[in-house]
Design a protein with these regions (language model features):
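Single-stranded nucleic acid-binding surfaces, predominantly the OB-fold ssDNA-binding core
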Residues: 1-99
């Protein structure tokens, strides 16, 4: 599945090693406006882990609060904690841009 996200970094980007390959990792908050049953607007935040092939030169610019765009292959896993179901959204980006 291909997914595109626009959102703000929840923390500074970091380099991580996954199965011997280096990636830049970012936690991205994506906000959505929804109407409640009573008609009021509510903002819902989704968190997405974005991985991009190592680009250590960009790390100095990718600080908490910066806005980014990323598009790529999406993996979604579910976990159950204390009876609640949580989604873990991971995006392995082929396209990435600092906004």
């Amino acid at each position: 599945m291909v997914l595109s996200v626009i959102g703000n970094l929840g923390s500074d980007a970091e380099l991580v090693n996954i199965k011997g390959k280096k990636y830049m990792h970012m936690n991205v908050a994506c906000n959505e406006q929804r109407k409640k049953d009573n008609g009021d607007q509510a903002e819902v935040t989704y968190w997405c882990s974005v991985y991009f092939k190592e680009s250590s030169k960009m790390l100095e610019y990718l600080k908490k609060g910066k806005r980014i765009y990323a598009s790529g292959t999406c993996r979604i896993n579910t976990t159950v904690k204390e009876g609640k179901c949580y989604l873990d959204i991971s995006l392995f980006a082929q396209c990435f841009q600092l906004l």
